[in-house]
C-alpha cells in the first residue's frame, strides 16, 4: 500500500484535522489493504466549503470555452490513465475488469461531452411587445454544489454530477463513498493538472455523518446532489430542503422486465441475466424482477437458471462476476435470500456462497434465481442490491403491467415482446423514468436524461444530457431597452 491519500482542498493536497485515515480493502480478498484515505470531520468539510465559496466569482466569470477546455483536457488525461483507473476501480469496488473499464470510459466520455456544453449554455432571444427592447434569457450558475456519490459506480456517477456542475460555472465540494474513493481522487488530480483554478473543486473523504452532513447543512452550499439508498436519500432530501437548498436525489429501484408470451425465452433470459447479474446486481437499475407470461414461464426459467449456473464468479481481475463490495452488502443479500425462502419462494439457482479456491476469502455470492414468487413478498418489493432475480408468473399482459407498477420504486423497466402494441402500451403505462423495449434495464446513454418516479428519485431534476445542466443553472430574463 502507498502512503495515505489526501483531501484536495483549495488546490492543495491536505491531511484531515483528525489525523486519522480509513483503510480500503479488496472485496475479493479482504485481507489485502488497497489504500488508505483521510477520515475527515466537520471542520475539514467546512474548510472545503469556504474554499469553494471563495472561488465562486473567478470560476463563474471564466469564459465558457475556457471552462470547456479544462474539462476536455481532464477527460484526455483520464483516457491516458484508463488502465490504471480500471485497476483502482476493480481493486476497491470489485467490478469485473471489463465492467470497470467500461465505467472508466463512460467517465471520460462524460467529461468530453460536457466540455462542449460549457461554451453553449442555453438561453433564448424573444420578441418584446414594445419597440427598442432586446428581450432574452440566459443560464447562470447557482453557486456552490455539494455532491455526495455512491460506491457502486465510483467514477461514472461522480463524473456525471461534477462535469455539468463545472461546465455551468459552479464550484464544487464532493464527498465520494468511503468504500471506493480512489478514482474520484484521480479525477481531482486530472482536473488540477488540466488547470482548474484553486478552490473550484474540493474533495473530502470521510463519513457521511460528518462530511456529508456538513456539506448539506453549511450555509455556503447552494445545491445538493445525492445518489445512494432511498432511506439515506430521503433524509438528505429533508435536511437539504429544510436548509433552503436546491436538491437532487437518485435513489433505489425494484426494476422489472416483463416477458410477454411472444418473447423468445432464450433471448429474454439473456436480457434478464445481463440486467440482473451484471455488476453483481449492485446497480440501482438492475433487474430484480422477471415478470413472465405463463405460456413461456417454464422455458424462461430453465434458460435463466442455465445462465445463472454458468456464470464464472471470482475476483474481478479475471472472472465474469466479481464480489459484493463489502461484508455488510454480502450479509444483506444472504439475509434476503433467507427471507425469500421463509416466505415460500422456491430457490432454483444459487442462494449461497460459491465454493473454490478463487472465492474462499472474498465477499462472493452465487447468482440467485427464485420462482413461485408472490408479488407481495419482500423479495419482490424491496431493493436487494445483489445478484438475485425473483421470477413472477402472470396470466396476461395487463396482470404483468399491474405487477410491474405495484412497488414503491419507478427507476427502470423493460419489456421483451414481439407485439408492437404491447410495447407501446408498456411505454405509455409503466411507472418508470427509464423504459426499454427488448433490452435490459441497465445501461444508460450519457446524452439523454436519467431519473425515476416515486421513491426512486426527486422527480424535479434529472441527471445527464442537457437536462443534467438544468439542476446546476438558474435562468435570468433580461429586458434591454435602448
UniProtKB/Swiss-Prot annotation:
Keyword Cell cycle in annotation: no
Catalytic activity: 2,5-dioxopentanoate + NADP(+) + H2O = 2-oxoglutarate + NADPH + 2 H(+)
Entry keyword set: Carbohydrate metabolism, NADP, Oxidoreductase, Plasmid
One Pfam family of this chain: Aldedh
Function: Alpha-ketoglutarate semialdehyde dehydrogenase involved in the degradation of D-xylose, a major component of hemicelluloses such as xylan. Catalyzes the fifth reaction in the xylose utilization pathway through dehydratation of alpha-ketoglutarate semialdehyde (2,5-dioxopentanoate) into alpha-ketoglutarate.
Quaternary context: Homotetramer.
Protein name (record): Alpha-ketoglutarate semialdehyde dehydrogenase
Amino acid at each position: 500500500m502507498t502512503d495515505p491519500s489526501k483531501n484536495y482542498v483549495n488546490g492543495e493536497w491536505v491531511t484531515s484535522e483528525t489525523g486519522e485515515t480509513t483503510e480500503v480493502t479488496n472485496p475479493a480478498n479482504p485481507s489485502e489493504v488497497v489504500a488508505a484515505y483521510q477520515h475527515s470531520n466537520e471542520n475539514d468539510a467546512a474548510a472545503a466549503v469556504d474554499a469553494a465559496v471563495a472561488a465562486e466569482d473567478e470560476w463563474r466569470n471564466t469564459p465558457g470555452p475556457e471552462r470547456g477546455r479544462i474539462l476536455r483536457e481532464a477527460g484526455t488525461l483520464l483516457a491516458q490513465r484508463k488502465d490504471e483507473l480500471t485497476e483502482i476501480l476493480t481493486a476497491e469496488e470489485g467490478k469485473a475488469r471489463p465492467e470497470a473499464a467500461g465505467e472508466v470510459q463512460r467517465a471520460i466520455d462524460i467529461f468530453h461531452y460536457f466540455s462542449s456544453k460549457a461554451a453553449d449554455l442555453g438561453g433564448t432571444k424573444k420578441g418584446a411587445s414594445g419597440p427598442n427592447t432586446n428581450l432574452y434569457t440566459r443560464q447562470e450558475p447557482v453557486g456552490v454544489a455539494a455532491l455526495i456519490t455512491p460506491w457502486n459506480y465510483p467514477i461514472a456517477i461522480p463524473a456525471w454530477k461534477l462535469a455539468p456542475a463545472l461546465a455551468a460555472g459552479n464550484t464544487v465540494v464532493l464527498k465520494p463513498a468511503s468504500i471506493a474513493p480512489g478514482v474520484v481522487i484521480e479525477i481531482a488530480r486530472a482536473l488540477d493538472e488540466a488547470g482548474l483554478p484553486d478552490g473550484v473543486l474540493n474533495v473530502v473523504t470521510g463519513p457521511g455523518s460528518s462530511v456529508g452532513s456538513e456539506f448539506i447543512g453549511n450555509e455556503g452550499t447552494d445545491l445538493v446532489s445525492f445518489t445512494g439508498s432511498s432511506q439515506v436519500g430521503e433524509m438528505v432530501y429533508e435536511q437539504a430542503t429544510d436548509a433552503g437548498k436546491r436538491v437532487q436525489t437518485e435513489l433505489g429501484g425494484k426494476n422489472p422486465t416483463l416477458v410477454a408470451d411472444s418473447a423468445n425465452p432464450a433471448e429474454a433470459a439473456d436480457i434478464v441475466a445481463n440486467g440482473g447479474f451484471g455488476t453483481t446486481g449492485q446497480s440501482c437499475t438492475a433487474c430484480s424482477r422477471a415478470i413472465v407470461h405463463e405460456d413461456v414461464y417454464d422455458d424462461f426459467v430453465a434458460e435463466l437458471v442455465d445462465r445463472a449456473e454458468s456464470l464464472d464468479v471470482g475476483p474481478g481481475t479475471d472472472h465474469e462476476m466479481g464480489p459484493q463490495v463489502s461484508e455488510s452488502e454480502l450479509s444483506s443479500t444472504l439475509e434476503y435470500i433467507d427471507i425469500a425462502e421463509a416466505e415460500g419462494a422456491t430457490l432454483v439457482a444459487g442462494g449461497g456462497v460459491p465454493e473454490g479456491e478463487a472465492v474462499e476469502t472474498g465477499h462472493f455470492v452465487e447468482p440467485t434465481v427464485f420462482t413461485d414468487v408472490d408479488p407481495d413478498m419482500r423479495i419482490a418489493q424491496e431493493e436487494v442490491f445483489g445478484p438475485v432475480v425473483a421470477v413472477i408468473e402472470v396470466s396476461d399482459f395487463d396482470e404483468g403491467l399491474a405487477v410491474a407498477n405495484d412497488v414503491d420504486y419507478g427507476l427502470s423497466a423493460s419489456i421483451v415482446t414481439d407485439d408492437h402494441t404491447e410495447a407501446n402500451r408498456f411505454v405509455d403505462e409503466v411507472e418508470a423514468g427509464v423504459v426499454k423495449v427488448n433490452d435490459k434495464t441497465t445501461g444508460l446513454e450519457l446524452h439523454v436524461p436519467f431519473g425515476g418516479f416515486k421513491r426512486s428519485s426527486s422527480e424535479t431534476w434529472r441527471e445527464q444530457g442537457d437536462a443534467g445542466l438544468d439542476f446546476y443553472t438558474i435562468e435570468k430574463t433580461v429586458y434591454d431597452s435602448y
